[in-house]
UniProtKB/Swiss-Prot annotation:
Record's protein name: Glycine cleavage system H protein
Subunit structure: The glycine cleavage system is composed of four proteins: P, T, L and H.
Segments of this protein annotated with the region Disordered: 111-130
Entry keywords, A to Z: Lipoyl
Chain ranges of the Lipoyl-binding domain: 24-106
Reported cofactor(s): (R)-lipoate
Keyword Hydrolase among record annotations: no
Described function: The glycine cleavage system catalyzes the degradation of glycine. The H protein shuttles the methylamine group of glycine from the P protein to the T protein.
Amino acid sequence: MTQVPDNLKYNRTHEWTRLEDDGTLTIGITDHAQSELGDLVFVETPTVGRHYDAEEACAVVESVKAASDIYAPVGGEVIEANSELQDSPELVNTDPYGEGWIMRIRPDDSDDLEQLLDPEDYQDLVADEE
């Protein structure tokens, strides 16, 4: 069964977003996404300091099966990329909602989070895809 934490927001391309206390967003790929991809062998993290628009490709994850773009769920500037993933891409598989986070951004408008899926809607999306 796919883990879908109830304190996160989701988008249709299987990224999760967590609003931090300082107003920044931590972003990664969902448990469903990492499961579908299989064992990750490489993560290309986004460029710190670069601005990405909502739904713009900003990172890449590669597994033994496929490569997949990661999309910015909302517009904003990347303030941190998870450097641990350079040497340990498997963190995305083993802890997708924790140590396997991919980036942190400062959103242009935190109200944009309202456009993302809540956990129940994301679970419905995953169920429809299976």
